[in-house]
Amino acid sequence: MADQYEKRITWTIKNFSSLQSHAIYFDIFVVGDTKWHLLAYPKGYGDSINKCLSLFLGVPDPDDLPSGWKRHIIYRLTVVNQMSEKLSKQEVARGGFYPRSLTFGSQVMLPLTELYGGFLVSGQVKIVAEVGVLEVVGKSDVLEETLLVNGGINVNGFQVLPSQVESVNNLFKNHPDIASNFRLENTHLRTTYLNSLLCLTELLCQSPHKLSNVDLANAHCTLTCVTKAGFKLDWLEKKLKEVGKTRMQQLEQNLKDLKESLCWSSDDEDDLSRSVKT
């Protein structure tokens, strides 16, 4: 499998400053055939207590996996700077998960002294996790079990959750030949690629000004991945280019406005300097 992030999770922690819990968890999610969760320590963990926000990615139910299991993954954890994307804190790494190694992440993800530098806005801290599975040892049937428990439904040859039926039906209605070249027969792989496609279409339905450069870069990677799998996505590629162009125009306008603001400030200082001299 190529080094691609298969799933992107956004976790908004509300009322961060008033949290009393030592540790907080994000809802369990599935990537590949494995359940994962995010674990955060708002006041730090280990040597970082009262110093840093600690953040980890972990396997919550190792007993559900077969004997000898192992998962080799690539992941990126980001604490988003909501004022300036470039100042966001990231942990990018590969990790080998197995029974005696169930978590990866960082004890020093974000110094607490930096919270008010754009990371804590309106009482909220925003975390983004991106995960891709590179190698699987000991297959799990968690995805098939999840579909069974939730009443998996066959839509155009893909097993989907009831909550996804409308979106998938609309996708095939608007683009009837979208899967005409899709040849994978494995149920898990078919569902994984379709989920990636649904996430991509949902992302590109957002207003361009809400999308970061990281969002667009990940969208390009996902589009390449699902296209190689056999989906016909010329229309989506066009949409992504349009969104990228709009985003670029917005950035250029923001830069222009900033330059004009700086020029006005400089003129005001010159006027003040002249008035003081007179």
UniProtKB/Swiss-Prot annotation:
Residues 6-131 form the MATH domain. InterPro entries: MATH-CC_domain_protein (IPR050804), MATH/TRAF_dom (IPR002083), TRAF-like (IPR008974). SUPFAM superfamilies: TRAF domain-like. Keywords: Coiled coil. It holds the Pfam family MATH_2. Residues 232-267 form a coiled coil. It comes from the Eukaryota. This is MATH domain and coiled-coil domain-containing protein At1g31400. It comes from Arabidopsis thaliana (Mouse-ear cress).
